[in-house]
């Protein structure tokens, strides 16, 4: 279930309000282009600037519009355990298939604090939980040992690994086995991540290149030479897009790309701002190189 290409959905805005029409359009664009899973209200969805009502609404819309065609992995993380429980409980009631829960940011818990945070959510909720380990944003790195302890709990099923450290894939596989789901949060390392035992990605690029990302993920997990060569070919096409998505703060570049494709406006909420003209040129060039524009 939790494998292949899963999109870290952007949240479209119009005049600083949620653009429901554009959001529904984005969801169906993903459904029709082979995306396995939809991930609303994550980092790329600008969750830090969504109100609680908006956070719940984007999850509700995602579940409703996907209508069982795609899995929904709802972003429900917070640096407040109480709030994370509340958001996860809502996602469960809404019908989400799983929750993506980021390691608590800013308050810098110990490894025991991380364990107790996820255990408390696990004990109060009944849907699968995917740990989101992103030390670059959370300023805390969950250790493999802590992850292994959490995997013993009933609802913890895997990790979105955004450490950028490919050795972690091997370490986590050795410690937890192949039943522990490993999804990369770094588009640029997806090929090697899967080669080492990962099973997919939660992708920024998939917002604008869903079919390419889906085809790449499928090819990368088929054990024959022809498929491996196809995965390498698709990865080479995707790499310029991956690079262009992170020249400036995510999700500003991907929102500009989505605007070029007519999917939604490029509006972001402060403190994020729209991309500069030099970045626009690079994003546009990357889309053209992949025949997306």
Swiss-Prot record:
Which residues make up the annotated site Part of a proton relay during catalysis? 43, 106
User: In what pathway does it function?
Assistant: Amino-acid biosynthesis; L-lysine biosynthesis via DAP pathway; (S)-tetrahydrodipicolinate from L-aspartate: step 3/4
Q: A single GO molecular function, which one?
A: 4-hydroxy-tetrahydrodipicolinate synthase activity
Q: Which SMART domains match?
A: DHDPS
Where is this gene product found? Answer: Cytoplasm
**Gene Ontology CC, one term:** cytosol
Reactions mediated catalytically? L-aspartate 4-semialdehyde + pyruvate = (2S,4S)-4-hydroxy-2,3,4,5-tetrahydrodipicolinate + H2O + H(+)
Report the leader peptide range: none
One of the Pfam families matching this protein, by short name: DHDPS
PROSITE patterns named among the record's database cross-references? DHDPS_1, DHDPS_2
Mind listing the GO biological process terms from this record?
Answer: diaminopimelate biosynthetic process; lysine biosynthetic process via diaminopimelate
**InterPro entries given for it?**
Aldolase_TIM (IPR013785), DapA (IPR005263), DapA-like (IPR002220), Schiff_base-form_aldolases_AS (IPR020625), Schiff_base-form_aldolases_CS (IPR020624)
What keywords would UniProt list here?
Amino-acid biosynthesis, Cytoplasm, Diaminopimelate biosynthesis, Lyase, Lysine biosynthesis, Schiff base
EC number of the protein: 4.3.3.7
> Which catalytic residues are annotated?
132, 160
The record's note on quaternary structure and interaction partners says:
Homotetramer; dimer of dimers.
Q: Which family does the entry's similarity section mention?
A: Belongs to the DapA family.
Record's protein name:
4-hydroxy-tetrahydrodipicolinate synthase
Q: Which organism is it from?
A: Pelagibacter ubique (strain HTCC1062)
Q: What is the lineage of its organism?
A: Bacteria, Pseudomonadati, Pseudomonadota, Alphaproteobacteria, Candidatus Pelagibacterales
In the UniProt record, the gene name given for this protein reads dapA
């Amino acid at each position: 279930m939790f494998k292949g290409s899963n999109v870290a959905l952007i949240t479209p805005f119009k005049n600083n309000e949620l653009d429901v029409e554009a959001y529904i359009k984005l969801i169906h664009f993903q459904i029709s282009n082979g995306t396995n899973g939809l991930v609303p209200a994550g980092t790329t969805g600008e969750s830090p600037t969504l109100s609680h009502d908006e956070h719940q609404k984007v999850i509700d819309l995602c579940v409703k519009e996907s209508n069982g065609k795609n899995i929904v992995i709802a972003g429900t993380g917070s640096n407040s355990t109480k709030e994370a429980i509340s958001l996860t409980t809502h996602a469960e009631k809404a019908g989400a298939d799983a929750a993506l829960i980021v390691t608590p940011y800013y308050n810098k818990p110990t490894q025991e604090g991380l364990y107790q945070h996820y255990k408390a959510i696990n004990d109060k909720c009944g849907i699968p939980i995917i740990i989101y380990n992103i030390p670059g944003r959370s300023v805390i790195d969950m250790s493999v040992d802590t992850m292994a302890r959490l995997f013993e709990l009933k609802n913890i099923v895997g990790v979105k690994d955004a450490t950028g450290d490919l050795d972690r894939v091997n370490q986590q596989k050795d410690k937890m086995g192949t039943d522990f789901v490993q999804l990369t949060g770094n588009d640029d390392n997806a090929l090697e991540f899967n080669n080492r035992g990962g099973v997919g990605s939660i992708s920024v690029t998939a917002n604008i290149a869903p079919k390419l990302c889906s085809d790449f993920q499928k090819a990368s997990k088929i054990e024959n030479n022809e498929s491996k060569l196809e995965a390498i070919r698709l990865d080479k096409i995707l790499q310029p897009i991956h690079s262009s998505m992170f020249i400036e703060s995510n999700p500003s570049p991907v929102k500009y790309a989505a605007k070029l494709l007519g999917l939604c406006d490029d509006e972001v909420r402060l403190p994020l701002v729209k991309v500069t003209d030099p970045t626009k040129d690079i994003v546009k060039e990357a889309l053209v190189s992949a025949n997306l524009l």
